[in-house]
């Protein structure tokens, strides 16, 4: 992977990893992660695609947004990144918070998106689920960083899960606390922002989760795919929130089929 930096407006920079040649595939990770969190997909797809994995604002080496930034600000950031890359319409995939950003870009700037993929996204949370995630965002604001609870929620005890868990733990331990807090608040408040725009998405849309992800549920996944004009829902058995790391072969297979669909 080649480490690169985009120069954005207002003296901000966006860091990304780049590998491979071909159609552009842009990847956006979730809250608390970094560009490397797509490592199985970068390795696999860079054989035939031009893969660009971005550090979200305030994560990795990318400049943070303002502390009060909302989901729309992260979407504007992604739009500016795609413009600055100057690759034309891209295949855009997001995980978790990255999925909300991907949805926002696809709804507001369809001219920039050839295909879109949402992995472990959220859609119209229940009241209880929304309250729980807002409470977690508030705890972060107060400086309480709980690493073990999400790790227990995201990973089981298989060998591949233990390996992925160690990498994710390291990223969380080294997270920029203010950038993490800003992104988590936007994530907590963002599930409704573009939810009603799914019916406007006309490009091929892959929506994927695991059966055992309690917050990005199979029901949400099916609803999103059903709303899109050309949506496909895939729910992988016995997988949780970090499915791209714990079931990379199945995720790569689903994404490969998505990339081969005709826009």
From Swiss-Prot:
State the reactions this protein catalyses: (E)-2-((N-methylformamido) methylene)succinate + 2 H2O + H(+) = succinate semialdehyde + methylamine + formate + CO2
| EC numbers on record | 3.5.1.-
What's in the keyword line of the UniProt record?
Hydrolase
Which GO terms label this protein's molecular function in UniProt?
Answer: hydrolase activity, acting on carbon-nitrogen (but not peptide) bonds
Q: List, from the UniProt record, the residues annotated as the active site of this protein.
A: 96 (nucleophile), 120, 241
Primary enzyme class: hydrolase
In the UniProt record, does the keyword Zinc-finger occur? no
Q: How does it assemble?
A: Monomer.
Function text: Involved in the degradation of the pyridine ring of trigonelline (TG; N-methylnicotinate) into succinate and methylamine as carbon and nitrogen sources, respectively. Catalyzes the hydrolysis of (E)-2-((N-methylformamido)methylene)succinate (MFMS) into formic acid, succinate semialdehyde (SSA), methylamine and carbon dioxide.
Family, per the entry?
Belongs to the AB hydrolase superfamily.
Protein's name in the database: (E)-2-((N-methylformamido)methylene)succinate hydrolase
The lineage is: Bacteria, Pseudomonadati, Pseudomonadota, Gammaproteobacteria, Moraxellales
């Amino acid at each position: 992977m080649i480490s690169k930096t985009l120069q954005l407006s207002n003296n901000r920079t966006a860091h990304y990893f780049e590998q491979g040649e071909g159609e552009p595939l842009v990847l956006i990770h979730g809250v608390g992660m970094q560009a490397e969190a797509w490592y199985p997909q970068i390795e696999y797809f860079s054989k035939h695609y031009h893969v660009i994995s971005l550090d979200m604002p305030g994560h990795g080496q990318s400049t943070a947004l303002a502390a009060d930034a909302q989901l729309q600000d992260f979407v504007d950031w992604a739009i500016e990144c795609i413009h600055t890359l100057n690759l034309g319409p891209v295949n855009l995939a997001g995980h978790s918070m990255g999925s909300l950003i991907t949805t926002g870009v696809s709804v507001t700037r369809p001219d920039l998106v050839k295909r879109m993929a949402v992995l472990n996204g959220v859609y119209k949370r229940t009241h209880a689920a929304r309250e729980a995630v807002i409470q977690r965002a508030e705890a972060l604001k107060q400086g309480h960083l709980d690493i073990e609870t999400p790790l227990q929620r995201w990973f089981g005890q298989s060998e591949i899960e233990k390996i992925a868990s160690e990498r994710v733990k390291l990223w969380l331990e080294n997270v920029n606390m203010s950038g993490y807090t800003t992104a988590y608040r936007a994530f907590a408040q963002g599930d409704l922002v573009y939810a009603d725009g799914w019916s406007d998405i006309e490009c091929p849309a892959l929506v994927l989760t695991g059966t055992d992800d309690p917050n990005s549920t199979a029901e949400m996944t099916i609803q999103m795919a059903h709303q899109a004009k050309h949506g496909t829902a895939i729910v992988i058995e016995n997988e949780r929130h970090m499915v791209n790391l714990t079931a990379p072969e199945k995720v790569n297979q689903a994404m490969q089929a998505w990339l081969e669909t005709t826009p």
